[in-house]
Amino acid sequence: MHHGFIRSILIRVFAAAALLATTSLATKAIAQTPEDKTLPTNTRFFIPQPASGSIQQAVGLLEKFQLKNALLIAAMEATPQAVWLTGNTPAQTASTVATTLREANFQRAVPIFVLYNIPGRDCGSYSAGGAENTADYDAWIDAIAGAIGNQKVVILLEPDAIADLPSDCGYDPTQVNIPEAVANRYAQINYAITRLEQQPKTIVYIDAGNSHWQAVPVITQRLITAGVQQAQGFFSNVSNYNLSTYESKFDTWVSACMAFGMNPADGGWRLGNYSYCASQYYSPLGTVNPDDITTWIYTDEWFQQNMGTAVPSTHFVIDTSRNGQGPFNAASYATPPYNQSASVITTLNNGGWCNPPARGLGVPPTVSTGVALLDAYLWVKTPGQSDGTCDSAGGVRAWDYSVYEPAGWPTTAAQQAIFDPLWGLYDPAAGAWFPQQALDLAQRANPPLH
């Protein structure tokens, strides 16, 4: 087959799939008050240009006569997804925003922007980077706000920035003034919320980590300090794999804990005492297991008994881009033919956030969630893009090669240290297209891709 002909056909397939997606998302509108920033039920989310590498992968699949798989990649890329703003100069970023807004206007759709440029981003790990200092960050935020103008957009502000404060990074206190770094982080988030929310149609959500990270009272206090009351709400599960049932319950508790700590009734004993809240890890009413949602009834009961007149009102959104099959569990690698030890399994599970295999795309973006405070399910993480080089050198993989090492796997310690045994290859860098993972996600989508 001629490569150029295949590419032209596939581009038409991508375009047709995108058109079908944008025309099928509209539903009957409902009236919204000007002050209400909750997305209306007829919201149509923006579909960005296909991710770099996706068209090439689909072309390659067609050349191998794998039409079904090529169409799966096309369908994935024709689903609304977030646009990540991860750096560049204020002028360059403003230009990217302006271009995206023009494309979104053409689609009559609402774009989702992820702002990911906080100083000290990702604790210097796989996605390290960010602005040099607060002044540079504030200027970057100003440029984005100015470019947005009066257009409706959704902003997801700085994933991991609140769940992973500088105090969580393990910095050497002789090298980093940790209290100052934490104070700066909160100031940066507060400024960003205030500046972005000045735009009349900008809807801002801030970072709450996920249901298997910070405990409910901890993240609630952090969200309050970060200024969540000035935003529409918070988001969870970005770039993660937790099932939406867990995330929705966790987020509902966080919203409830906020209301609890602001309730002045009964002598004001609740005021500011977010630490009293039960969580996904603890309830005084019974043993709670973060991995067993049936035990979460004890936390539900705690809130039912202690809320008083408080009514949760803080909204949230959930990233469903890769949670169709839930989180990774390495237990099968303890059995033949792998026969990996308990310590290896523990390391693999702890690194389960990093390019886990056999996951799937989750619920496509929608505002029809059935949960009062859950504004939307969104595809925030770009599915198909690598989480990073997930290997033993980075601490997220372990493997006993003396027990299981197929032909073609590396045989030297140096190469094994940068090899991913779960995929049987060397992972692409963070943000690069990972074709094997992309196809795996599409094939295992839940619900299936259309």
How would you name each of these model-derived features?
Residues 88-91, 102-207, 218-232:
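Substrate-binding cleft of extracellular glycoside hydrolase catalytic domains
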Residues 2-14:
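Bacterial N-terminal signal peptides that target proteins for export
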Residues 161, 210, 322:
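Short, glycine/acidic-enriched loop or turn micro-motifs at the edges of active sites
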Residues 32-40:
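Cleaved targeting-peptide boundary
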Residues 39-147, 381-419, 426-429, 433-434, ...:
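N-terminal carbohydrate-binding/catalytic regions of secreted carbohydrate-active enzymes
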Residues 41-47, 82-83, 111-113, 153-157, ...:
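Hydrophobic faces of well-ordered beta-strands that scaffold small-molecule active sites
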Residues 33, 60-72, 214-403:
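Surface-exposed substrate-engagement region within the catalytic domains
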Residues 19-29:
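C-terminal segment of classical bacterial N-terminal signal peptides
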